């Protein structure tokens, strides 16, 4: 299933997102009842903007998240049912934005827009960005250089640069397990940089190198490519800003 979703990586995922939301925008603009496809679109739109659609979207999403949390089935997020749920929720939120982002007089409802657009951006970044997410592991001994790493299913993948482990050190606790460790690495023979636990090195936009583990033989690095995470962060900040304004000034605008 993982290989299937990678087919939709950039730029195809971005194109599909534009087509999906563009299609719903067309349905919104053609919402007056008419003949043929316009009548079908109008009826579909009425349902998607109904309380039943909103409640069902929230209930299904919460139920899916509870299932993942209690079952530990992380593979469920890559299944067609979960993808359909997220797409359904995004569509409902998008249509709510189209309907309510302005007052009848034309003034923008900034608190409403920040909250709903932030939610849509956070959900959308996680959804449409999944095909571009790559996680790899790379074991290196001191002084060793590699331009390839291993995906989580064991395939060899090119990094696009040379990673060299210049030096590493670790401190152990009383039972002999590492309590702190760090490594110095260089990328394409550039100046060495230090990587510690939970403090990765950002080698490119949306690509970070983490220090996963160390041993006497060397270090294991985790390379994570997640370019859409910044859009998710912007969405979360928008959501928080809207919630803060709502708390300070109330729901009036």
Where are these regions (language model features)?
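Solvent-exposed, non-transmembrane regions of integral membrane proteins
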Residues: 1-253
């Amino acid at each position: 299933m993982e290989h299937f979703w990678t087919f939709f990586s950039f730029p195809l995922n971005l194109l599909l997102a534009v087509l999906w939301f563009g299609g719903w925008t067309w349905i919104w603009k053609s919402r007056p009842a008419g003949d043929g496809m316009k009548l079908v679109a109008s009826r579909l739109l009425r349902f998607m903007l109904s309380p039943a659609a909103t409640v069902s979207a929230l209930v299904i999403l919460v139920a899916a998240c509870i299932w993942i949390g209690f079952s530990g089935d992380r593979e469920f997020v890559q299944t067609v049912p979960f993808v359909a749920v997220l797409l359904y929720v995004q569509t409902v939120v998008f249509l709510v934005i189209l309907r309510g982002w302005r007052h009848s007089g034309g003034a923008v409802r900034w608190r409403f827009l920040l909250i709903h657009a932030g939610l849509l951006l956070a959900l959308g970044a996680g959804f449409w960005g999944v095909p571009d997410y790559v996680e790899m592991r790379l074991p290196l001994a001191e002084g060793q250089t590699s331009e390839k790493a291993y995906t989580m299913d064991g395939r060899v993948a090119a990094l696009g640069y040379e990673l060299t482990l210049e030096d590493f050190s670790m401190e152990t606790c009383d039972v002999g397990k590492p309590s702190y460790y760090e490594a110095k690495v260089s990328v394409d023979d550039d100046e060495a940089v230090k990587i510690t636990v939970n403090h990765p090195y950002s080698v490119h936009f949306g690509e970070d190198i983490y220090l996963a583990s160390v041993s006497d033989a060397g270090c294991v690095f985790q390379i994570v490519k997640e370019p859409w995470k910044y859009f998710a962060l912007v969405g979360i900040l928008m959501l928080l800003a809207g919630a803060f304004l709502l708390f300070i000034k109330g729901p009036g605008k």
